[in-house]
């Protein structure tokens, strides 16, 4: 990522985008779509984010296509974030940890929802640490409907999103204060020769737990700069956020900790325009983010 910059491209094989690529809405169409996207993005971006819901539409064959996109992206030297937003309690959380960090669905990081309780995610946090992967928790989503819950004020005067950020910060501080263990150096804790998501270089060491904080909206949640983990920032392009919004909203974050994400706005360029469009956006982001 030190060479290719911070842009993360979402791979969302919706029926509309499959049609734009002149592909069938089928498992074969999913596989072809993903392979075309990865070929176009290879050497342009370092991180891709397949949206799992579009693969689940096709059942077991769709999940097999998801496994294929993870393998193809890794062969191309990319990191993969599985955008599945999983979250549950007790044994169910353990099962998600097994499926998404130790099983055949495992990518380099998984998105998670904290709304059954932040500490209910602990089995996935521990699995991320143990396997050298990342868990990226939804804190402030890019859709306006999220404000009703995420911006709600708690009895101590803080908001829900601030409370979630604070807990993530505690997890990362504990992890970074402990001796480094074995694991795969991905979007989680920095491994040999890496300095968090930015690769080798001046970026800080980052913990295994990151936050989803949308690039849309005004002032970012208080405490974001002390997160100690990756910030995944969706909403660039089709949802209305601009490169200038990203620069302003995340100016207080450490170098190489922010991953702005664009999906539909780039994919709608089609197979003939994706490579060039992603390259332009990557360069614009690299010019404004440390």
Regions found by a protein language model. Name each.
Residues 1-68, 72-81, 275-286:
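Conserved N-terminal beta1-alpha1 strand-loop-helix module at the mouth
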Residues 9, 48, 83, 110, ...:
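Conserved, mostly hydrophobic/aromatic
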Residues 246-253, 257, 268-290:
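C-terminal helical cap(s) of enzyme catalytic domains, especially alpha/beta-barrels
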Residues 2, 38-44, 70-75, 125-131, ...:
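Acidic (Asp/Glu)-rich catalytic clusters
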Residues 13-16, 84, 88-184, 198-210, ...:
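Conserved anion-binding
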Residues 3-7, 43-46, 76-78, 106-108, ...:
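Short, well-ordered coil/turn segments that N-cap beta-strands
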Residues 211, 215-261:
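A C-terminal functional module that forms or caps the active site or interfaces directly
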Residues 57-72, 89-94, 116-129, 216-224, ...:
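Active-site-adjacent beta->alpha loops and helix N-cap segments on the catalytic face
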